Amino acid sequence: DRWVWSGDAIQSYLMNYYLFFDSESVKRTIWLLRGKDPVTSHSNTIMDYTFYWFLSVYDYYLYSGDRQFVNQLYPRMQTMMDYVLGRTNKNGMVEGMSGDWVFVDWADGYLDKKGELSFEQVLFCRSLETMALCAGLVGDRTNQQKYEKLETTFWNASKQALVHNSINGVQSDAVTRYANMFSVFFNYLTPERQQAIKHSVLLNDSILKITTPYMRFYELEALCALGEQETVMQEMKAYWGGMLKEGATSFWEKYNPEESGTQHLSMYGRPYGKSLCHAWGASPIYLLGKYYLGVKPVKEGYKEFSITP
């Protein structure tokens, strides 16, 4: 798979910060994914991938402290966010419109993409936070206040979780892992709700399982953020170790331990359609650096940092 995908790239950047710290390749890729004005579609045509693009700027600034890059990129960030805000619905939320690909994940099971997905709103909110941060860095106080105001529920008390989506103002009964795990490591919920999500969603085998390294990245990060490093280590050994036992020499686009033989090679309706060397496959690099060695920037560019193994 040789195209540059925003959702894949953001994970590559995070791994890079703990392995090579090659800032130049990160900056080039962020610029490449943004493209030129006027904005006529989402990044890679995928709504969630536009939000990952904003988040990648947030992450890059945190790890590098490179304010000059933010200054250069900010006008393109503005026009990209203007495009997003021009496509919100009457509730001020994002949902798939004509020409949009609402991706989320390659799921083994039905994943409803209709209406207002809580997952997309969480990413949208984080993108607005990024815009507010960057507006402050470049001295754009007017727009900083606008973006902060736009930051704004999908919580279901009986399920002790964020529901998957809302259609025509009505909460669905479905609960998936996606919004719940992101809301944990974005620190959007009270400690009590985070613990509720850990038990009712993340450690609940009845919730639709994730079978891509792409989203296992975030699932395991949420568990690490909740102090479940021992559980995550077992999962890393079983999941990535499972690929190694199948003969992998690089990590795959998708891996379902319940499959066998050539089933592991098929995807997209093609018997050998799966990428076996995929950008989103190597999340243990990031998880081990951040949550096991415990190295994290507290302020931009490691002006302050914590090391808590």
Which positions does each model-derived feature cover?
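Short, hydrophobic/amphipathic alpha-helical patches that form generic packing surfaces
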Residues: 15-19, 183-187, 286-293
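Structural helix-adjacent loops and short alpha-helical linkers that scaffold large soluble proteins
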Residues: 17-30, 61-81, 89, 132-155, ...
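Repeat-solenoid scaffold signature
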Residues: 206-246
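Active-site-proximal structural scaffolding
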Residues: 5, 22, 26, 46-53, ...
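Non-catalytic C-terminal accessory modules of carbohydrate-active enzymes
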Residues: 233-309
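Substrate-binding groove/exosite segments of carbohydrate-active enzymes
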Residues: 1-86, 91, 95-98, 213-219
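The feature captures the catalytic groove of carbohydrate-active enzymes
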Residues: 36-52, 85-152, 156-221
